[in-house]
Regions:
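Extracytoplasmic gate region of multi-pass secondary transporters
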Residues: 23-24, 219-262, 266-270
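Interfacial helix-cap and linker-helix signal at transmembrane-aqueous boundaries
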Residues: 30-31, 62-63, 143-152, 246-247, ...
Length: 406
């Protein structure tokens, strides 16, 4: 039953990943069809992320009221209905309206399942959870690229993805009773198997032994939140504007650009699958550091003049980004205490999607005033700032741990 339950959680994250990459892949064809400028993709992305921020902040209380299973089911229904509406929307104004439930559904799934896995499973499960997000994010542009190339239609692509989402809704509905059974089993296991003394002591030191009324005052939280903000901003920046960069600055066909963006998400997916095994031997902090370095190398490759290097750069960026987000999430209970983790996870999701909300649209404004070719340079700046923020968290927590042992 435990294996079946994990499969259900992974399927839920596939449903979360599919819509995340669709807009950027379809936009080169959507834009002229709707008769709007480049910047409207950023506005739609901002609305989606705004809904995600709201539902992320509310996820803690929603889980307590209706449970993780029901919240996941309702959220998947919202995203499926919104995607179906995208396929039939007559104008960009309707897309803006439908972006609201799309964001609300995605944020609730993200925050609730991330907290559940961080609190109940090991680091490799967190990496594999986000690997399955990558499966969805990779599949989205592939599906869209097929309909754009074979049917010359982005609308059919959205409709096909909506039908996939509704099939996942059916699976979640059938297996809904399993959530309560697993929760009861987990509760019995925690009562019968208390944490080892070393683990309990580590968690006590991480949280200073009590529930913090203001999680923002915990040591290291603020630079950690900055890392989340910049990570999601950088990841969505490439996902949303990568195809437009390839088509506009590198003269690559729109359907090929959409396919290459799917391979960028494929790099994230494969990277998380592999790092799930690596976490059995290597600490999250080490993987986060090296992931940032690899992503920077991919960004440098995008600056090269030869278009044939672009695919390699995108895949390398995806591989580098792979361990960062799940690693930061899984470290939350250990760094800041399990009793603070639920509330802090909601803050982290909200801040992360704030990056998704504002950084890609701001780049859209910048691209309209300058040129889409500045994408690699902006990405490299963001990655540098994130690296500095992540290392600051490590330094603060290391100094705090050293002083606590004296």
């Amino acid at each position: 039953m435990a294996t079946l339950f994990l499969i259900i959680i992974y399927l839920a994250f596939i449903s979360l990943g599919i819509p995340d990459s669709l807009l950027g892949a379809a936009w080169p064809m959507m834009r002229p069809d709707l008769g709007v400028s480049f910047g409207y993709a950023g506005i739609l992305s901002m609305i989606v992320a705004g809904g995600t921020i709201v539902s992320s902040l509310a996820s803690g209380s929603l889980v307590q009221r209706i449970g993780t299973g029901r919240l996941t089911l309702i959220s998947c229904c919202l995203t499926a209905g919104a995607l179906l509406g995208f396929g039939w929307a007559p104008s960009v104004a309707w897309l803006a309206v439908l972006a609201i439930p799309l964001g609300l559904g995605g944020g609730a799934i993200d925050a609730a399942l991330n907290h559940y896995v961080a609190d109940n499973y090991k680091a490799h499960h967190m990496n594999w959870l986000h690997c399955f997000w990558g499966v969805g994010a990779t599949a989205g542009p592939i599906i869209m690229s097929f309909y754009m190339a074979e049917h010359n239609s982005w609308r059919e692509g959205y409709t096909a993805v909506a039908l996939i989402q509704f099939s996942l809704v059916a699976i979640l509905l059938i297996t809904l009773p399993l959530w309560k059974r697993v929760a009861a089993i987990r509760e019995k296991e925690q009562i019968g198997n208390p944490a080892p003394p070393a683990q309990a002591e580590a968690e006590s030191k991480a949280s200073s032994g009590s529930l913090s009324k203001n999680v923002l005052r915990i040591r290291g939280v603020k630079p950690s939140l900055a890392a989340f903000l910049i990570y999601c901003g950088a990841e969505s920046l490439v996902g949303l504007w990568g195809a437009s960069y390839l088509a506009g600055a590198r003269n690559i066909a729109a359907e090929t650009a959409a396919l290459w963006i799917s391979l960028y998400y494929g790099g994230i997916t494969v990277g998380r699958l592999v790092t799930g095994f690596i976490t059995l031997k290597v600490r999250n902090t080490v993987l986060i550091r090296w992931g940032q370095i690899v992503a920077v190398a991919g960004g440098v490759i995008l600056l090269l003049p030869n278009p044939s290097f672009m695919l390699a750069g995108l895949i390398l960026i995806g591989l580098g980004l792979a361990p960062i987000y799940p690693g930061l999430l899984h470290e939350t209970p250990a760094r800041f205490g399990r009793e603070n983790a639920a509330r802090l996870m909601g803050f982290q999701m909200a801040v992360a999607y704030t990056g998704t909300t504002f950084l890609p649209p701001l780049f859209g404004v910048l691209a309209m005033r300058t040129d889409i070719s500045v994408l690699p340079a902006i990405f490299l700046i963001l990655m540098t700032v994130m690296l500095l923020s992540a290392e600051k968290v490590n330094r603060i927590l290391h100094n705090h741990s050293a002083s606590a042992q004296k």
